[in-house]
Amino acid sequence: MTTMLKTQVHVVVIYLLIQIAFSQVKPGSDLKWSTLKSVVTITNRLGDGSTLKLHCKSADDDLGLKILAPNGSWSFKFRPSIVPGVTLFFCHFTWPGQSKWFNIYDDDRDGVRMGIPCIYCIWDIGKYGPCRFSEIDDAFNICYDWNGNRRS
């Protein structure tokens, strides 16, 4: 084998190895998620005319006390951590005679890499717990009990 032919074989082998390595990488969309912002929208659907007070926080951000009239909404935006399972926002909800909490955004549940992903996480807050909008079903049917257990 001539030197030139050996060089060409080496180039082809290296090229094939690079192609195989890149074929094992997930599509580039995973890289783009780190630049997207998620939006959480919370709507008062208590249904009895009660005002809903909520106070949402993460480990880094305190979003302050919000007061929602019946059917009123409030939204916030954030950039989830590029590290899976890290981003968490929890909210304390109160209305006459009640005090509840819920993880309104949990990367393990809502993150784009796992769970039931959402970029626009739209929540209706009812007396029995929060329900998230499903883009697949076009309905608020991803429901949880207070403090996080999924309802069937």
Curated annotation (Swiss-Prot):
Keywords: Glycoprotein, Secreted, Self-incompatibility, Signal. It comes from the Eukaryota. Residues 1-23 form the signal peptide. Glycans are attached at N71. Its main location: secreted. The keyword Signal applies. It is found in: Secreted. GO terms for cellular component: extracellular region. GO terms for biological process: rejection of self pollen. Pfam families: Self-incomp_S1. Belongs to the plant self-incompatibility (S1) protein family. This is S-protein homolog 4. It comes from Arabidopsis thaliana (Mouse-ear cress). The lineage of its organism: Eukaryota, Viridiplantae, Streptophyta, Embryophyta, Tracheophyta. The gene is SPH4.
